[in-house]
Amino acid sequence: MRKKSHVSLSRYLLDHIDSELLENHRKAFIVGSVLPDCKPSFVTTKHNMEETFDMVCEFIRKLTVNSDDYKKISTAYCRKLGEVTHYLADYFTFPHNCVFTGSIREHCIYEKKLKFALRSYIRSGEINVNSTVVRRFTTPQQLCDYVIQIHQQYLKCNKTVESDCRYIVALCHVAVAGILNLLEHYRNSNPVAAAAAA
């Protein structure tokens, strides 16, 4: 996805996920959502499931279970959460998948169309997110398994910018809400850490 698409997505997530943490660190979350495209590794590491999913699952673990120092849950935390959305969104962008056989030029043309389609989809108010699944995650691994399951579903569907929009928005919404829910769960199960964060 293009940087502007990642910004549009991050703004949607900020506006539709009820989180004081995100609200207090909006800019960090938005910056995080474009950061992977600004790193030198962008040239050598493809943003696809095969090359980066293990890293993303590790990020998810650190954003939930391994967040021992709750005083640091702030700007850096939200920036890293934004990075997670970047990779997840790219996994559901057709040219970032092994089923795409087009050229770099076709990749760029597709992402340009996706930029406009995503903006239009977000503004349409026709977004359908299964928020009930968020509460089912009791471990970071369950969330990662869910991403794999939805990605397998995605690979079987017709690849259009419209289907990409639906998958990207719904999956990223569930993932961010799921990460924040897991964080809250682990904070509540560790009263000492929760008191330190207050």
Residue ranges and their predicted role:
Residues M1-E83, L88-A198:
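N-terminal leader/auxiliary helical segments
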